[in-house]
Amino acid sequence: MAISQERKNEIIKEYARHEGDTGSPEVQIAVLTEDINQLNEHARTHKKDHHSYRGLMKKIGHRRNLLAYLRKTDIQRYRELIQRLGLRR
């Protein structure tokens, strides 16, 4: 359950800090969040698909690590990002 290339490019364009930015924590977290949301919907409808569920857990862990890094390095960017993505209600 990967997101389409077009959708991924839209996310990158929206969250990029400068032209050609694909590796900043904001972009990586935004792409992972979209992927996690799709996998979450898949897991709700296919409850016995444990393989995809494990992939979902790995992506959540990766996003958690990136969020911790961003919080540690630049708290203001972290707060803006979680507000834009709607995380940490």
UniProtKB/Swiss-Prot annotation:
GO terms for cellular component: cytosolic small ribosomal subunit. SUPFAM superfamilies: S15/NS1 RNA-binding domain (SSF47060). Pfam families: Ribosomal_S15. SMART domains: Ribosomal_S15 (SM01387). It comes from the Bacteria. Residues 1-21 have a biased composition (Basic and acidic residues). InterPro entries: Ribosomal_uS15, Ribosomal_uS15_bac-type, uS15_NS1_RNA-bd_sf. One of its GO terms (molecular function) is structural constituent of ribosome. GO terms for biological process: translation. Keywords: Ribonucleoprotein, Ribosomal protein, RNA-binding, rRNA-binding. Residues 1-24 are annotated as: Disordered. One of the primary rRNA binding proteins, it binds directly to 16S rRNA where it helps nucleate assembly of the platform of the 30S subunit by binding and bridging several RNA helices of the 16S rRNA. Forms an intersubunit bridge (bridge B4) with the 23S rRNA of the 50S subunit in the ribosome. PANTHER family: RIBOSOMAL PROTEIN S15, BACTERIAL AND ORGANELLAR (PTHR23321), SMALL RIBOSOMAL SUBUNIT PROTEIN US15M (PTHR23321:SF26). Part of the 30S ribosomal subunit. Forms a bridge to the 50S subunit in the 70S ribosome, contacting the 23S rRNA. Belongs to the universal ribosomal protein uS15 family. This is Small ribosomal subunit protein uS15.
